Regions:
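Hydrophobic alpha-helical transmembrane segments
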Residues: 9, 13-16, 23-167
């Protein structure tokens, strides 16, 4: 998802960008994006204190995976040929999204507490909003690759926020 979305960011038309996402090969932008996000995650994880490592890692994972639900619910599916993201989008109704959000909040607060949870949630919501607006403008909606890219970006940002000395 992250690599395909990054590869689609080149100077392409919307149609060409979506075609690039369907291509199974990885390009330069995709390789650089994978390297950058993986390096950021490793650096952030190595900077976490031992007592915060597991709660923060789990909180990052919960937030990142939850982010697929509002994106898939609120944005149209961008590709003609239906992929995995289209199946997810068709399953999410408002009640399901509210229930998943409540469960995510319970997990987040149970793992890192209220103050830290609000910081992590704020970062995740900022990434969710910015990527959602970008996907709508650039691709006309969301794809499964976009959902995966947002997952990885939110996970990396969550880990980075948790390394702040006042976290």
């Amino acid at each position: 998802g992250l690599a395909d979305t990054a590869d689609a960011l080149g100077p392409h038309s919307r149609e060409k960008s979506l075609e690039v996402m369907r291509d199974s090969r990885i390009g330069t932008f995709g390789a650089v994006a994978l390297w950058a996000v993986l390096t950021l995650k490793v650096a952030a994880l190595s900077a976490l204190s031992p007592h915060a490592f597991w709660p923060v890692l789990l909180a990052a994972h919960v937030l990142a995976r939850w982010s697929s639900l509002p994106l898939a619910r609120w944005l149209p599916y961008a590709q003609e040929a239906k992929g995995l993201g289209a199946g997810l989008a068709s399953l999410i109704d408002v009640r399901g999204l509210v229930a998943a959000t409540a469960l995510m909040l319970l997990c987040l607060l149970g793992l890192v507490g209220l103050r830290r949870g609000l910081w992590l949630l704020g970062g995740a919501l900022a990434v969710l909003l910015l990527t959602g607006l970008f996907y709508r403008r650039r691709f006309g909606g969301v794809t499964g690759d976009c959902l995966g890219a947002t997952n990885q970006l939110i996970e990396a940002l969550t880990l980075l926020i948790a390394t702040h000395p006042h976290f």
